[in-house]
Design a protein with these regions (language model features):
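NAD-dependent ADP-ribosyltransferases
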Residues: 69
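Basic, Lys/Arg-enriched alpha-helical interface segments
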Residues: 1-66, 75-81
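Short beta-strand-loop-alpha-helix junction that forms the active-site gateway
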Residues: 84-87
Length: 87
């Protein structure tokens, strides 16, 4: 897959704000500095990436420590939709 664009849903943005307010702003910074560049190049593969089973549409998970970031990929338009974050 060529470069994939990243789109943050409103729910995901709310989750990130909550993460930052709870004193974990470094997690949000790491997401933007390290995770997004990786997802732009290889959204399906990586040491912290896992495809979730039995989800429709297909949903992927990126893990940073105890945090999980969930996203869906539009293969046709080459967009990764960041849909939720959870601890």
């Amino acid at each position: 897959m060529n470069k994939c664009r990243i789109f943050e849903t409103k729910q995901f943005q709310k989750d990130l704000e909550q993460i930052a307010r709870s004193g974990h702003s470094k997690v949000a910074q790491k997401l933007r500095d390290f995770v997004y560049p990786q997802l732009r190049k290889h959204p399906h593969f990586g040491p912290n990436i896992k495809k979730l089973k039995d989800f429709t549409p297909d949903t992927w998970r990126y893990r940073i420590g105890a945090w999980r970031f969930f996203y869906e990929i539009d293969e046709e338009d080459k967009v990764a939709f960041m849909v939720a974050a959870s601890h």
